Amino acid sequence: MLSARIESPVLLQEGCPSMDSSSDKKEELRQQLRQAALEYHQFPTPGKISVTPTKGLLNQRDLALAYSPGVAAPCEEIVKDPANSYKYTARGNLVAVISNGTAVLGLGNIGPLASKPVMEGKGVLFKKFAAIDVFDIEINETDPDKLVDIIAALEPTFGGVNLEDIKAPECF
């Protein structure tokens, strides 16, 4: 399950800072929220997403069906009709959330690696509110033509692509 709680004493006891707070109090609350956010993203497992099997993998038979030799049957069906990829794989419920980190949330051009927490965050929104699985993909490329080529090459994997936080006009 993709849920967690922020257990910051400040947030639980005092709520959000009011507009009437002194600047010292606001800074203290901001620092406490920052620390709570860092802990939220780090514990108990770093990040906000994971990959979980949808099939039982309890014994040798399950493993043989999931991989070799059983996996050959759906592969052959997809060769016959590529639309079968939606029938036999997660593709139909899998979206790529892709960014190069050039225009992130008011943070600006922070690059692909630093944008990863934001893309994971977008992924958990897809999962929580639409039950859609997401892979976040951060690409170290700013040339628009190369970026398009990279993203287009990923098409066989995903049922959808969400471009996120790519600066204009490159995002168009």
What are these regions (language model features)?
Residues 20-172:
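N-terminal ligand-binding/catalytic initiation module
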